[in-house]
Amino acid sequence: MLTLKLLRENPEFVIEKLAKKNFDAKEIVAKINDLDQNRRALQAELDACLAEQKKKAALIGGLMKEGKREEAEAVKAEVAALKTRSAEIEKTSQENNAELDALVVLLPNIPCDLVPEGNCAEDNVVVKTGNEIPELGENSLPHWELAKKYDIIDFDLGVKLTGAGFPVYKGKGARLQRALINFFLDINTNAGYLEVEPPVMVNEASGFGTGQLPDKEGQMYHATADNFYMVPTAEVPVTNIFRDVILANNEFPVKMTAYTPCFRREAGSYGKDVRGLNRLHQLDKVEIVRVERPEDSYAALDEMVAHVESIVKSLGLPYRILRLCGGDMSFTSAITYDFEVYSAAQGRWLEISSVSNFESFQANRLKLRYKDAEGKTQLAHTLNGSSLALPRVVAALLENNQKGDRIEIPEALRPYTGFDYID
């Protein structure tokens, strides 16, 4: 959430920057500043009214002691009138502030200067590539056919049990899932991330804190009986650990990692992009989250990108790193790097990770602050990234490593799987 101070002092800057995200903020910013001016004027009037009320109320006892009953009664009437006026101001102020709050949360985060111009995924900038794309034989199969051939993932059974997008992993397929989760978590914890196991359902305040609400209700599974939301990513519960927290200056860096199943409605998805593991409603994902001082957050972002790259490299998957353009960025992000791996049998790139710096956008919603070196309270910066999302990693591993009548497991994973190949 953008600060009222920024919107008040630099409205044209905000409008210009949000245009980079294809967001026309002119009318909203103008309305916000009108309401903010009203807010401050009403607060000043209320403060003056309460001060006068307190001042006059203090006179009543003295007047009564002096026997000036009529004067005391007159002052009482004035105090009563001031109380009535204070209540009227408070009611008007509450209505004004509710409208103000509802508008401020509609504004996305400002993209940083590193973000390229552009409207869609085609305008994203490839900043790095790595690992060779394998050449597969003529009889190579996409992962959904390999899954059926080796009986390791049952998509039809998932449809029977729940619906499309809820696969059942079996045998070596299930063991591969478990191996990848443990592999990713071990790499993260060895890099200094504290492992946590959060709930997979969150309340509305948590969804608001990280920016999923009120922006993404339609993409989240909602348990209406208790007003809980299934997590779309571990980012939500892990970052909300720090909601309403003031960190000491010596507590940085804050580094956490978590595995959770993630749940996404993905309404409206169709076509070749949803075959097999390409797009699911339930998926396994390991996340890394950081909280940093503002001056350290971009160095932390570079560390996170390098960290995720090292994981992808170790799996031997051909990959590329993209810096997202303004028009393809999320509502909450100031800058995002996507990682994609090449699916040789499908002949296309698959996204497996997004690493983002949100600067103070989430922290302002969360009231996540810290005491700086001078003892002043400041908003912290938050960052997160997938390390990694499993479904498309599994898809690429199966497709790219099919050799003859078996699928070879990357060397780095073998201590975790307990087997060298799937046949």
Model-derived regions, located:
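N-terminal alpha-helical targeting/anchoring segments
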Residues: 1-134, 152, 156
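TRNA-recognition modules of translation machinery and tRNA-sensing kinases, especially anticodon-binding
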Residues: 129-423
